[in-house]
Amino acid sequence: MTLQMEDESTIQKNIADKLISALKTGGFLLYAQKILPLAASTGSERPFQEILVRFKEEEENLLPPGTFFPMLQEYRLLPYLDRWVVSRLASWIQESRTRTPGWPVPVNGVNLSEDTLREPKFADFVAKHIENAKLPREVFTFELGWDTALLHAEQVKIIQARLEPLGCRFTFAGFDGSEGSFNFLKVLRPDFVKLTYGIVKDIDRGLAACEKVESINNKCHAMGIRTIAEFVESHEVLEQLRLIEVDFAQGLIIGGPQKLT
């Protein structure tokens, strides 16, 4: 092994040790990004947000997820992170309700890793926190990548059967409406799908792109599945999504991630 390889190995080991320590000592931070309902408000909707995770470095520098997620994955630590997110989020909701009576509890999109999906006791862990924190229904909307949901369809059905009776919902992200995909939706029946950025970004520029999104949206609605457009970057795209009757939108034009306080 060369000196450079030894140095890289040492650096990776140090980072892994920091991540393990952070899981034990609260070295991660929760952020939330707003998901905006596009239909006319009835006044009864609860706030909707996606929960994001940041790793707090020694000097309070915030790193984007891409820098530490691969390390967590390599060392099989993602299930521990997912559990930490559920636990911390439940505590935050409980604290907020105590501090502010009548506070509207948001619906929270929580990302799940493949490793967590295969973890048999995760559903029991979630159920315990829902019960202990006396959380209302629909607090957790667990989000899976579309490819992950397809690859682990049986595990998805198992965790749905366990958590849906407790009021948990499910979102599949990165949905593009490709051939055969709606057959899988009929089987897996998520509550939401997030439309992939590639089919949403140009809907204000041409009829074909607009018609494709509208077709996907209508098919989802026919199955009782609500739609979310991600990475919305302009008011023009946002307005087109309203006209097509996509249910929700998320992106920097609506609001960036904000630290949970």
State the predicted function of each range.
Residues 15, 71-72, 85-92, 126, ...:
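Structural preference for long, well-ordered alpha-helical segments in enzyme cores
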Residues 46, 77-155, 231:
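Catalytic core of bacterial c-di-GMP phosphodiesterases, primarily the EAL and HD-GYP domains
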Residues 69-70, 79, 161:
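Conserved long alpha-helical elements within nucleotide-processing catalytic cores of c-di-GMP signaling
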Residues 93-97, 130-131, 157-167, 214-221, ...:
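Surface-exposed amphipathic alpha-helices with a cationic face
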